Amino acid sequence: MMPATLAGLALAVTVATMFAQRVDSTTIHHVSGLKGKPLLFGPSLRRTLPAGGTFKWVLVLSDPCAPKPTEICVSVGHCFYDLVSSDNDSECANKDRRVLTLALLTKSKTGELRVIGPMAASSALVGDAGELEQLRRRVSAGMGLTDDGDISFAAADKVNEGLYGVRVMGSGDSYTFFNVTVATETAGDDRDLATVRHVDIAHNIVPSEDRDHVFVSMPRMHVAWPHGTTVLHPKMIIAAASWRPEYNFTYEWYAVPYDGYCATMRLFEACLYHPSAPACLDPAGHRGCVVGTMTHDDLVGRVLMARCRGSDLRTCEPHVIHIKQKPMVSLGRAVPELRVESAAHIPSLYILVVKIDDSVAGWAYTELMAEGSSPRVVIDIHMPRPTSAQGGIAALREIENDDSAPSLGSNEGGGPGNSKRRAAVLGAAVWIALTLLILGGLGAYVAVNKKCLRDKRQWLRGSRKPTLETHAHTYTSLPVGGDLSLEQDAEDEDEDEEELLYERERRRSSSGSKKSSRSPSRRSSRRNSFGPTLSANALSRFDKTVKLAMAEVAGRLLANKTFPSQRY
């Protein structure tokens, strides 16, 4: 047995006891110590590791892109610590994590741990192997391993700080991490290891037995049968909280077609928990290569499982809420099985989401592909970049369905597809503005014309005057001025009689001239009989009367300022 203090053993037991309280995420423990004092941490895997089992210790190198322990809350009262990578996606998106392997151990048949050495390199390592070896020696200086497989430092130093991880090889379990910090010892501090070394767990993590646990898994890839039915059969285990005698949950199937040009299919896990986030509604990148918030068009089926008791899903009462007819899909007998007919074999990413109380409790995905290559699915734990500066242009989502070329494997918003999409948005805005301008101009023109016509009609009604017929063939009466006396009226009557006699004689004489050859004596006698009655004075008065009448008519016309109409 390697040398260890009694306090170290007691703390190792404390750490082992602490591991009985686990969370459904990457387990992270916070370890702090004093500079120059002994430090011990680890899960004591020798006690639980079967014979022949192997596990390894790693150190996540300090880097701007390295993941950092962060408290994450998925619901009220359900918070845990997990590793969160840097938000600087532009620099860290395609950068591998620098992980340094410290030790690789195996358990023999006799129950002892044997160090089979740190590996010279790992597939996850980036950098020169010689540089990494020097770094390993510097970090492991003063580091030892206990019989239980824990890490110990005889005198902790600042160089020993970092994020240490341990994982059992081949078990499928995730890493258990220890976030180690070393504080500087103050003067007069004589605290021992038992009081200095401690493990802090977030106080608001709900114990595992007091909340729901959902486990969902299925193969990452399915090859579609050309002339048959493809069955998607995930494994789902639900362990409800102890205070739930009965519970309801829903499971939803989504099918997101992917573009054949995509080198990778990027699925943003954060959008499953925050579907209304603006960046998830309109993530940057080509629509066929990026999955943010899944829409109703992507929904294939939704089933409500009511009045479930315990973990036996056969006690639930299924209620199909939604099932899509195209593509041809149907629910299988087992929950949550999905059957996809051959007619619906479109290369797609099928996603299963399980919700309890409208909160996402678990999810899984698989690729349904035809024979041949398929894009590599990348699960991104970050929030996506929004297409616009404000993000979430939900009203223009239909414009994304253009025929623009995809941005292959890109997580940025400046690819060819986004440039064409922005050009389409700008063109649509210009056309809308021009249409509104033209319609507004036409409306103003019609309104002005209507007003002008209305004003003109009112002016014509108010200024219309009666017209005089000055071009008739015969006057029926002549206007007489108001200054004429009664005596003149009597004289006018006499003159009128004389004028009538004169007019008759003139007509007879004009007609008789044509017959002068037949009756010359008769025409001569008539002229002699009427001649003495028409004196020169009568002719003078008649001429004066005609002139007065004409002057009166002209005066009235000028006074009224009315232009007579002409009728023929």
Curated annotation (Swiss-Prot):
Encoding gene per record: US8
Membrane-spanning segments: 423-443
Purpose of the protein: In epithelial cells, the heterodimer gE/gI is required for the cell-to-cell spread of the virus, by sorting nascent virions to cell junctions. Once the virus reaches the cell junctions, virus particles can spread to adjacent cells extremely rapidly through interactions with cellular receptors that accumulate at these junctions. Implicated in basolateral spread in polarized cells. In neuronal cells, gE/gI is essential for the anterograde spread of the infection throughout the host nervous system.
Position of the signal peptide: 1-20
Residue ranges that the UniProt entry lists as topological domain Virion surface: 21-422
Segments of this protein annotated with the region Disordered: 470-534
Post-translational changes noted in the entry: Phosphorylated on serines within the acidic cluster. Phosphorylation determines whether endocytosed viral gE traffics to the trans-Golgi network or recycles to the cell membrane.
Subcellular compartments: Virion membrane; Host cell membrane; Host cell junction; Host Golgi apparatus membrane
Region (Acidic): 482-497
Keyword Ribosomal protein recorded: no
InterPro entries for this protein: Herpes_gE_N, Herpes_glycopE_Fc, Ig-like_dom_sf, Ig-like_fold
Domain of life the protein comes from: Viruses
GO BP terms, alphabetized: endocytosis involved in viral entry into host cell
All ranges on the Intravirion side of the membrane: 444-568
First-listed, main subcellular location of the protein, grouped into a coarse class: virion
Acidic residues composition-biased segments: 486-500
Keyword Cell inner membrane: no
Annotated Basic residues bias: 515-526
GO cellular component: host cell endosome membrane; host cell Golgi membrane; host cell junction; membrane; viral envelope; virion membrane
Disulfide bridge partners, by residue number: 271-280
Motif (Internalization motif): 465-468
Protein's UniProt name: Envelope glycoprotein E
Record-stated family: Belongs to the alphaherpesvirinae glycoprotein E family.
Glycosylation (residues): 88, 179, 248
Subunit relationships: Interacts with gI.
Membrane topology: Single-pass type I membrane protein; Single-pass membrane protein
UniProtKB keywords: Disulfide bond, Glycoprotein, Host cell junction, Host cell membrane, Host endosome, Host Golgi apparatus, Host membrane, Membrane, Signal, Transmembrane, Transmembrane helix, Viral envelope protein, Viral penetration into host cytoplasm, Virion, Virus endocytosis by host, Virus entry into host cell
